[in-house]
Amino acid sequence: MPTIPSVYRLQQPQMQLNGVAPTHSFSKQYPGLGSTVSGNTSLNNSAICIINAYASGGTLNKKNTTKKNNTVSNNNSVSTTSFFISKPNFSHTNSKVTIQLFYYTASPKNHLVNTSNNDLTTVSSHFSDLSTTLAQLYQKEVHVIATRLYYPYLNSDILSQYLAHNGPSNTFMDFQEAILTNPSLHKTNLPAHISGIKVQVSGRLVTETVIPRITVKSYLIGSFQRNSNNTANKLGDFVTSIDYSKFTTKNELGAFTVKVWICQRS
Protein backbone atom coordinates (compact mmCIF):
# COMPACT_ATOMS: atom_id res chain seq x y z
CA MET A 1 0.00 0.00 0.00
CA PRO A 2 1.42 3.42 -0.91
CA THR A 3 2.54 5.39 2.12
CA ILE A 4 3.77 8.91 2.77
CA PRO A 5 5.74 9.83 5.91
CA SER A 6 3.40 11.38 8.42
CA VAL A 7 4.23 14.91 9.57
CA TYR A 8 1.73 15.26 12.38
CA ARG A 9 -1.57 13.86 13.59
CA LEU A 10 -4.35 14.81 11.20
CA GLN A 11 -8.07 15.11 11.58
CA GLN A 12 -9.81 11.83 10.74
CA PRO A 13 -10.44 11.85 6.95
CA GLN A 14 -13.89 11.30 5.56
CA MET A 15 -14.98 8.79 2.95
CA GLN A 16 -18.28 8.40 1.14
CA LEU A 17 -19.16 5.36 -0.95
CA ASN A 18 -22.14 5.56 -3.27
CA GLY A 19 -23.96 3.04 -5.41
CA VAL A 20 -25.28 4.34 -8.72
CA ALA A 21 -28.30 3.14 -10.65
CA PRO A 22 -27.30 1.95 -14.14
CA THR A 23 -29.77 4.19 -15.98
CA HIS A 24 -27.68 7.35 -15.97
CA SER A 25 -24.46 8.41 -17.66
CA PHE A 26 -21.53 9.94 -15.90
CA SER A 27 -18.82 12.05 -17.50
CA LYS A 28 -15.58 13.32 -16.02
CA GLN A 29 -17.07 16.77 -15.35
CA TYR A 30 -18.54 17.67 -11.97
CA PRO A 31 -20.12 21.15 -11.80
CA GLY A 32 -18.77 23.18 -8.92
CA LEU A 33 -15.94 20.81 -8.14
CA GLY A 34 -13.07 22.51 -9.99
CA SER A 35 -9.79 23.17 -8.25
CA THR A 36 -9.77 26.72 -6.89
CA VAL A 37 -6.10 26.86 -5.88
CA SER A 38 -3.61 26.72 -8.75
CA GLY A 39 -0.78 25.96 -6.33
CA ASN A 40 -2.37 22.58 -5.59
CA THR A 41 -1.75 21.25 -9.11
CA SER A 42 1.42 19.45 -8.08
CA LEU A 43 -0.27 17.88 -5.06
CA ASN A 44 -3.20 16.82 -7.21
CA ASN A 45 -0.84 15.10 -9.65
CA SER A 46 0.79 13.25 -6.76
CA ALA A 47 -2.64 12.29 -5.46
CA ILE A 48 -3.58 10.88 -8.88
CA CYS A 49 -0.48 8.67 -8.81
CA ILE A 50 -1.41 7.40 -5.34
CA ILE A 51 -5.00 6.71 -6.37
CA ASN A 52 -3.79 4.82 -9.45
CA ALA A 53 -1.42 2.76 -7.33
CA TYR A 54 -4.25 1.82 -4.98
CA ALA A 55 -6.47 0.75 -7.87
CA SER A 56 -3.99 -0.99 -10.16
CA GLY A 57 -2.01 -2.54 -7.33
CA GLY A 58 -5.03 -4.47 -6.12
CA THR A 59 -5.35 -2.50 -2.88
CA LEU A 60 -8.93 -1.65 -3.84
CA ASN A 61 -9.56 -5.15 -5.14
CA LYS A 62 -10.27 -8.36 -3.26
CA LYS A 63 -6.91 -9.87 -4.25
CA ASN A 64 -3.51 -8.25 -3.86
CA THR A 65 -1.55 -8.35 -7.10
CA THR A 66 1.76 -6.98 -8.26
CA LYS A 67 1.60 -3.20 -8.27
CA LYS A 68 1.56 -1.59 -11.70
CA ASN A 69 0.78 1.93 -12.79
CA ASN A 70 -2.69 2.07 -14.34
CA THR A 71 -5.75 4.13 -15.12
CA VAL A 72 -4.97 7.82 -15.80
CA SER A 73 -1.64 7.41 -17.56
CA ASN A 74 -1.96 6.70 -21.26
CA ASN A 75 1.44 5.05 -21.74
CA ASN A 76 1.68 2.22 -19.21
CA SER A 77 0.82 -1.45 -19.12
CA VAL A 78 -2.63 -2.54 -18.02
CA SER A 79 -2.64 -4.36 -14.72
CA THR A 80 -4.32 -7.70 -14.11
CA THR A 81 -6.74 -6.23 -11.61
CA SER A 82 -10.40 -5.90 -12.55
CA PHE A 83 -10.87 -2.62 -10.68
CA PHE A 84 -11.17 0.50 -12.84
CA ILE A 85 -11.51 4.14 -11.81
CA SER A 86 -12.23 7.40 -13.61
CA LYS A 87 -10.02 10.46 -13.50
CA PRO A 88 -10.58 12.12 -10.12
CA ASN A 89 -11.85 15.66 -9.70
CA PHE A 90 -10.52 17.89 -6.90
CA SER A 91 -12.07 20.66 -4.84
CA HIS A 92 -9.96 22.58 -2.29
CA THR A 93 -10.77 24.68 0.75
CA ASN A 94 -8.45 25.91 3.48
CA SER A 95 -9.30 22.95 5.70
CA LYS A 96 -10.42 20.16 3.39
CA VAL A 97 -9.86 18.50 0.02
CA THR A 98 -12.79 16.80 -1.69
CA ILE A 99 -11.97 14.15 -4.30
CA GLN A 100 -14.76 12.73 -6.45
CA LEU A 101 -14.37 9.72 -8.73
CA PHE A 102 -16.26 6.81 -10.26
CA TYR A 103 -15.21 3.16 -10.03
CA TYR A 104 -16.23 -0.09 -11.66
CA THR A 105 -15.39 -3.67 -10.64
CA ALA A 106 -15.52 -6.20 -13.47
CA SER A 107 -17.09 -9.60 -12.94
CA PRO A 108 -14.78 -12.66 -12.95
CA LYS A 109 -16.10 -13.66 -16.37
CA ASN A 110 -15.30 -10.22 -17.83
CA HIS A 111 -18.91 -9.56 -18.78
CA LEU A 112 -19.76 -6.04 -19.85
CA VAL A 113 -22.43 -5.97 -17.14
CA ASN A 114 -21.26 -6.49 -13.58
CA THR A 115 -23.82 -8.06 -11.26
CA SER A 116 -21.58 -8.73 -8.27
CA ASN A 117 -22.52 -6.88 -5.08
CA ASN A 118 -20.15 -8.66 -2.69
CA ASP A 119 -17.37 -7.23 -0.58
CA LEU A 120 -18.65 -3.64 -0.62
CA THR A 121 -17.56 -3.36 3.00
CA THR A 122 -14.01 -4.31 1.99
CA VAL A 123 -13.99 -1.74 -0.81
CA SER A 124 -15.28 0.91 1.59
CA SER A 125 -12.48 0.10 4.03
CA HIS A 126 -9.82 0.42 1.33
CA PHE A 127 -11.17 3.79 0.21
CA SER A 128 -10.97 4.90 3.84
CA ASP A 129 -7.30 3.85 3.88
CA LEU A 130 -6.81 5.86 0.70
CA SER A 131 -8.30 8.93 2.39
CA THR A 132 -5.84 8.54 5.25
CA THR A 133 -2.87 8.32 2.88
CA LEU A 134 -4.01 11.36 0.90
CA ALA A 135 -4.54 13.32 4.12
CA GLN A 136 -0.83 12.87 4.83
CA LEU A 137 -0.04 14.25 1.38
CA TYR A 138 -2.23 17.35 1.68
CA GLN A 139 -1.72 17.80 5.43
CA LYS A 140 -5.43 18.44 5.83
CA GLU A 141 -8.70 16.52 5.89
CA VAL A 142 -9.47 14.57 2.71
CA HIS A 143 -12.98 13.54 1.72
CA VAL A 144 -13.12 10.85 -1.00
CA ILE A 145 -16.50 10.48 -2.73
CA ALA A 146 -16.34 7.17 -4.61
CA THR A 147 -19.40 6.41 -6.74
CA ARG A 148 -19.82 2.89 -8.04
CA LEU A 149 -20.88 2.38 -11.65
CA TYR A 150 -22.54 -0.90 -12.57
CA TYR A 151 -21.71 -0.65 -16.29
CA PRO A 152 -18.33 0.36 -17.78
CA TYR A 153 -19.89 2.27 -20.69
CA LEU A 154 -21.20 5.02 -18.36
CA ASN A 155 -17.75 6.68 -18.26
CA SER A 156 -15.21 6.96 -21.08
CA ASP A 157 -12.17 6.62 -18.78
CA ILE A 158 -13.46 3.36 -17.38
CA LEU A 159 -14.63 1.94 -20.71
CA SER A 160 -11.30 2.61 -22.46
CA GLN A 161 -9.40 0.90 -19.64
CA TYR A 162 -11.86 -1.97 -19.53
CA LEU A 163 -11.52 -2.71 -23.25
CA ALA A 164 -7.71 -2.46 -23.13
CA HIS A 165 -7.71 -4.79 -20.14
CA ASN A 166 -9.62 -7.37 -22.17
CA GLY A 167 -7.45 -6.89 -25.27
CA PRO A 168 -5.16 -9.91 -24.66
CA SER A 169 -8.06 -12.36 -24.94
CA ASN A 170 -10.36 -10.62 -27.44
CA THR A 171 -10.30 -9.31 -30.99
CA PHE A 172 -11.91 -6.07 -32.08
CA MET A 173 -14.72 -8.16 -33.55
CA ASP A 174 -15.29 -9.56 -30.07
CA PHE A 175 -15.69 -6.01 -28.74
CA GLN A 176 -18.12 -5.21 -31.54
CA GLU A 177 -20.07 -8.43 -31.03
CA ALA A 178 -20.37 -7.76 -27.31
CA ILE A 179 -21.85 -4.35 -28.05
CA LEU A 180 -24.25 -5.81 -30.61
CA THR A 181 -25.39 -8.84 -28.63
CA ASN A 182 -25.46 -7.39 -25.11
CA PRO A 183 -29.04 -6.14 -24.57
CA SER A 184 -27.89 -3.34 -22.28
CA LEU A 185 -25.74 -1.88 -25.07
CA HIS A 186 -28.17 -2.17 -27.96
CA LYS A 187 -28.82 1.18 -29.62
CA THR A 188 -32.54 0.89 -28.87
CA ASN A 189 -31.84 0.23 -25.20
CA LEU A 190 -29.06 2.69 -24.33
CA PRO A 191 -29.43 4.58 -21.04
CA ALA A 192 -31.61 7.66 -21.43
CA HIS A 193 -28.69 10.09 -21.06
CA ILE A 194 -26.50 8.36 -23.67
CA SER A 195 -27.28 8.80 -27.36
CA GLY A 196 -24.20 7.10 -28.81
CA ILE A 197 -20.92 5.29 -28.09
CA LYS A 198 -17.91 5.13 -30.41
CA VAL A 199 -14.92 2.84 -29.85
CA GLN A 200 -11.66 3.04 -31.83
CA VAL A 201 -8.63 0.75 -31.53
CA SER A 202 -5.31 1.80 -33.10
CA GLY A 203 -2.56 -0.80 -33.38
CA ARG A 204 -2.54 -4.58 -33.11
CA LEU A 205 -4.10 -6.73 -30.43
CA VAL A 206 -2.28 -9.98 -29.64
CA THR A 207 -5.22 -11.85 -31.14
CA GLU A 208 -4.75 -10.06 -34.48
CA THR A 209 -1.15 -10.75 -35.50
CA VAL A 210 -1.70 -10.62 -39.26
CA ILE A 211 -2.98 -7.06 -39.53
CA PRO A 212 -0.65 -4.06 -40.15
CA ARG A 213 0.66 -2.07 -37.20
CA ILE A 214 -1.03 1.11 -38.39
CA THR A 215 -4.49 -0.46 -38.52
CA VAL A 216 -7.28 1.66 -37.03
CA LYS A 217 -10.66 0.08 -36.38
CA SER A 218 -13.75 1.82 -35.08
CA TYR A 219 -17.33 1.01 -34.25
CA LEU A 220 -20.28 3.29 -33.54
CA ILE A 221 -23.55 2.51 -31.82
CA GLY A 222 -26.36 5.03 -31.58
CA SER A 223 -26.10 8.63 -32.79
CA PHE A 224 -23.59 11.47 -32.41
CA GLN A 225 -25.74 14.28 -33.81
CA ARG A 226 -25.02 17.51 -31.97
CA ASN A 227 -27.36 20.51 -31.78
CA SER A 228 -26.16 24.05 -31.22
CA ASN A 229 -27.21 25.62 -27.93
CA ASN A 230 -29.51 28.15 -29.62
CA THR A 231 -31.24 25.57 -31.79
CA ALA A 232 -31.67 23.17 -28.91
CA ASN A 233 -33.13 25.84 -26.65
CA LYS A 234 -35.61 27.02 -29.30
CA LEU A 235 -36.82 23.51 -30.03
CA GLY A 236 -36.72 22.34 -26.45
CA ASP A 237 -34.28 19.56 -27.34
CA PHE A 238 -31.36 18.21 -25.36
CA VAL A 239 -27.89 19.70 -25.80
CA THR A 240 -25.33 16.96 -26.35
CA SER A 241 -21.80 16.75 -24.98
CA ILE A 242 -18.97 14.33 -25.71
CA ASP A 243 -17.20 12.41 -22.95
CA TYR A 244 -13.85 11.37 -24.49
CA SER A 245 -10.95 9.32 -23.18
CA LYS A 246 -8.07 7.23 -24.50
CA PHE A 247 -5.90 4.54 -22.96
CA THR A 248 -2.58 3.38 -24.43
CA THR A 249 -0.77 0.23 -23.38
CA LYS A 250 1.62 -2.35 -24.83
CA ASN A 251 1.61 -6.01 -25.73
CA GLU A 252 4.19 -8.24 -27.43
CA LEU A 253 3.20 -6.80 -30.81
CA GLY A 254 3.74 -3.20 -29.76
CA ALA A 255 1.61 -0.37 -28.44
CA PHE A 256 -2.10 -0.04 -29.05
CA THR A 257 -4.58 2.65 -28.08
CA VAL A 258 -8.24 2.39 -27.20
CA LYS A 259 -10.26 5.59 -27.69
CA VAL A 260 -13.81 6.02 -26.47
CA TRP A 261 -16.40 8.71 -27.20
CA ILE A 262 -19.68 8.77 -25.29
CA CYS A 263 -22.31 11.20 -26.57
CA GLN A 264 -24.49 12.40 -23.70
CA ARG A 265 -27.66 14.44 -23.56
CA SER A 266 -27.58 17.25 -21.03
From Swiss-Prot:
The record's GO CC annotations read: mitochondrion; ribonucleoprotein complex; ribosome
Q: Which terms are listed as keywords in the entry?
A: Mitochondrion, Ribonucleoprotein, Ribosomal protein
Q: Which Gene3D superfamilies match?
A: Ribosomal protein S3, C-terminal domain
GO MF term set: structural constituent of ribosome
Domain of life of the source: Eukaryota
> What family is this protein classified in?
Belongs to the universal ribosomal protein uS3 family.
Name it.
Small ribosomal subunit protein uS3m
Q: Which organism is it from?
A: Mycosarcoma maydis
